[in-house]
Amino acid sequence: MDDHKPIDTPDGPAVDTPGIGAHRYEAPPTDRPITEAEAARAAGLAHNEHLKIASRYLRGGLADGLLKHATGAISEDDGQLVKFHGMYMQDDRDIRAERTKKKLEKAFSFMIRLRIAGGVVTPKQWLILDNIATTYAGNALRATTRQTFQYHGVIKSNLKRTMAAIDSALLDTIAACGDVNRNVMAATNPAQAGAHKAALQLAKDISDTLLPKTGAWREIWLDGERVVGGEDEAEVEPVYGKTYLPRKFKTVVAVPPSNEVDIFAHDLGFIAILDKKNRVTGWNVTVGGGMGMTHGETDTFPRTADVLGFVKPEDALKAAEAVMTVQRDWGNRKNRKNARLKYTIERFGLDAFRAEVEKRIGKKLEAPKPFTFENNGDRYGWVEGEDGRHHLTLYVPSGRIKDIDGGPQFLSGLRRIAEVHEGDFRLTGNQNVIIANVPAAKRAEIDALVDEYGLTRGASAIRRNSIACVALPTCGLALAESERYLPDLLTELEESLARHGLQDEPITIRSTGCPNGCARPFISEIGLVGRGPERYHLYLGAAFDGSRLSKLYREDVLASEIKDTLDPLFAAYAKDRQPGEHFGDFVIRAGFVAKTSNGPDFHERTGPLRAA
């Protein structure tokens, strides 16, 4: 698609400003042609828009900033651009005050996120990633909620070495963050080998098709040759243009009956429609999901995705590009808090959005096909696939792959397994690891290593269905603890649930240190969202399969009071639930909390409707 063609929006005709998208503006009174950055400023667009325009396809001052050895940081503007390269600049907030008192610079480091479509890596790649963790990243890998790895604590002087090592594994970090299509997730259900293969291939195809084409990543991090002339034909972004997308864009591929990728929480999704032999006949397309919001600003809200229509396999890539480019052209580039696709659809309506997608695909979407999701969790332990291969899902608390004193030796154990494993590894959207494609003859050897290193095949029902974001001390947005707090809370809740005979009842619980929603707390039956030190908003009433948003139940609950707040609800659930009724459905039916229909309704009728 031609990113330099003016495209009309439902608001009216667009001005032909290459790369800026369909935003009207008044040119300043001058005889000379205005620059693109001036046009962006004149349009009142967000700072990031003219930052992208002036970046020379995401180069900015990054190369020069890496040479400034007197600081562990990069400039604020380059801190925005480096996200497109898969990194966030962070500092250790545990020691921030101490360093400030001593008049020292913050303890800066970088979080590096990989692009691994579908979350599949080979044993050889695992060993390289393990070596990076032990050499540059504090002896830890972190499996994320979006099916990839993150490294934390990489200092600036080690960035290029780390990137070179990642490249040696035939992996990269391009577009793992930033205003682009990010890492594409795919279903990992190993029991459906054929459907998983189709889902994984679609995820890879979307990732490759929607990948930025700039050579900046290889040039800056691997000392690759710069494209002669800077902006010749090879440097034109054929899909994105110079301003890329208004905001992040997340894509997933799901295979019913499992919704472990949380398809309704993402901008774009594809739901596999299967025949009786588990073969993919096409895909339902979902659009407009997203978790992030801002405390106290009701024009920001989480939203579950709508089902847009059905496409045949040969049209799936066209649909992906069409949806993303409509968001490119219609999305809000003036206010980043309202820039995600969910707000675009709320603003223009699903029918208008569908019509534009169909126009770009060149055909009508078919009506959605029936589908059913049963849960959004993982299947733990061994599972045999249709092809006779075996797959072992391990429970990894908060996705933190490290050796724990007196506990599981995740880093060492998985390294040892990678040395003998003949299949592959798969990450799940619930931060767990699957040792996949194990021949039957190798199961005993894998089992022995799992036992030797104390790796966990499962845990309590509520712990198995828990997710936490990183939060403190590295995330600059965190208002409260999450990963370091949730395990202790789960121990308290396990005691409470056991007292009411609910210890085997699966209940989803997720915690985030801020309302950006990285752990997708607004579609968990119990959601904790940080408000301040040891204070959380408590959300209840989401669907067990991730298809319905929760509702705010209590504001600013102290961490010490969360167990006592939930205990009466557990007691009522144990006493009055119907057969097969999940906790999130029960608290709505029993009248403890209102049901959220979607989007703007999230902020309506909040609080407990009656005492527990």
Swiss-Prot record:
<keyword id="KW-0004">4Fe-4S</keyword>
<feature type="binding site">
    <location>
        <position position="518"/>
    </location>
    <ligand>
        <name>[4Fe-4S] cluster</name>
    </ligand>
</feature>
<dbReference type="GO" id="GO:0050311">
    <property type="term" value="F:sulfite reductase (ferredoxin) activity"/>
</dbReference>
<dbReference type="InterPro" id="IPR045854">
    <property type="entry name" value="NO2/SO3_Rdtase_4Fe4S_sf"/>
</dbReference>
<comment type="function">
    <text>Component of the sulfite reductase complex that catalyzes the 6-electron reduction of sulfite to sulfide. This is one of several activities required for the biosynthesis of L-cysteine from sulfate.</text>
</comment>
<dbReference type="InterPro" id="IPR005117">
    <property type="entry name" value="NiRdtase/SiRdtase_haem-b_fer"/>
</dbReference>
<dbReference type="GO" id="GO:0070814">
    <property type="term" value="P:hydrogen sulfide biosynthetic process"/>
</dbReference>
<dbReference type="GO" id="GO:0046872">
    <property type="term" value="F:metal ion binding"/>
</dbReference>
<dbReference type="InterPro" id="IPR045169">
    <property type="entry name" value="NO2/SO3_Rdtase_4Fe4S_prot"/>
</dbReference>
<comment type="pathway">
    <text>Sulfur metabolism; hydrogen sulfide biosynthesis; hydrogen sulfide from sulfite (NADPH route): step 1/1.</text>
</comment>
<dbReference type="GO" id="GO:0004783">
    <property type="term" value="F:sulfite reductase (NADPH) activity"/>
</dbReference>
<dbReference type="InterPro" id="IPR006067">
    <property type="entry name" value="NO2/SO3_Rdtase_4Fe4S_dom"/>
</dbReference>
<feature type="binding site">
    <location>
        <position position="469"/>
    </location>
    <ligand>
        <name>[4Fe-4S] cluster</name>
    </ligand>
</feature>
<dbReference type="InterPro" id="IPR036136">
    <property type="entry name" value="Nit/Sulf_reduc_fer-like_dom_sf"/>
</dbReference>
<dbReference type="Pfam" id="PF01077">
    <property type="entry name" value="NIR_SIR"/>
</dbReference>
<dbReference type="InterPro" id="IPR011786">
    <property type="entry name" value="CysI"/>
</dbReference>
<dbReference type="GO" id="GO:0020037">
    <property type="term" value="F:heme binding"/>
</dbReference>
<comment type="subunit">
    <text>Alpha(8)-beta(8). The alpha component is a flavoprotein, the beta component is a hemoprotein.</text>
</comment>
<feature type="binding site">
    <location>
        <position position="475"/>
    </location>
    <ligand>
        <name>[4Fe-4S] cluster</name>
    </ligand>
</feature>
<dbReference type="GO" id="GO:0009337">
    <property type="term" value="C:sulfite reductase complex (NADPH)"/>
</dbReference>
<keyword id="KW-0028">Amino-acid biosynthesis</keyword>
<protein>
    <recommendedName>
        <fullName>Sulfite reductase [NADPH] hemoprotein beta-component</fullName>
        <ecNumber>1.8.1.2</ecNumber>
    </recommendedName>
</protein>
<keyword id="KW-0560">Oxidoreductase</keyword>
<keyword id="KW-0411">Iron-sulfur</keyword>
<comment type="similarity">
    <text>Belongs to the nitrite and sulfite reductase 4Fe-4S domain family.</text>
</comment>
<dbReference type="InterPro" id="IPR006066">
    <property type="entry name" value="NO2/SO3_Rdtase_FeS/sirohaem_BS"/>
</dbReference>
<dbReference type="GO" id="GO:0050661">
    <property type="term" value="F:NADP binding"/>
</dbReference>
<feature type="region of interest" description="Disordered">
    <location>
        <begin position="1"/>
        <end position="32"/>
    </location>
</feature>
<keyword id="KW-0349">Heme</keyword>
<dbReference type="Pfam" id="PF03460">
    <property type="entry name" value="NIR_SIR_ferr"/>
</dbReference>
<dbReference type="GO" id="GO:0019344">
    <property type="term" value="P:cysteine biosynthetic process"/>
</dbReference>
<keyword id="KW-0479">Metal-binding</keyword>
<feature type="binding site" description="axial binding residue">
    <location>
        <position position="518"/>
    </location>
    <ligand>
        <name>siroheme</name>
    </ligand>
</feature>
<dbReference type="GO" id="GO:0051539">
    <property type="term" value="F:4 iron, 4 sulfur cluster binding"/>
</dbReference>
<feature type="binding site">
    <location>
        <position position="514"/>
    </location>
    <ligand>
        <name>[4Fe-4S] cluster</name>
    </ligand>
</feature>
<keyword id="KW-0198">Cysteine biosynthesis</keyword>
<keyword id="KW-0408">Iron</keyword>
<dbReference type="GO" id="GO:0000103">
    <property type="term" value="P:sulfate assimilation"/>
</dbReference>
<keyword id="KW-0521">NADP</keyword>
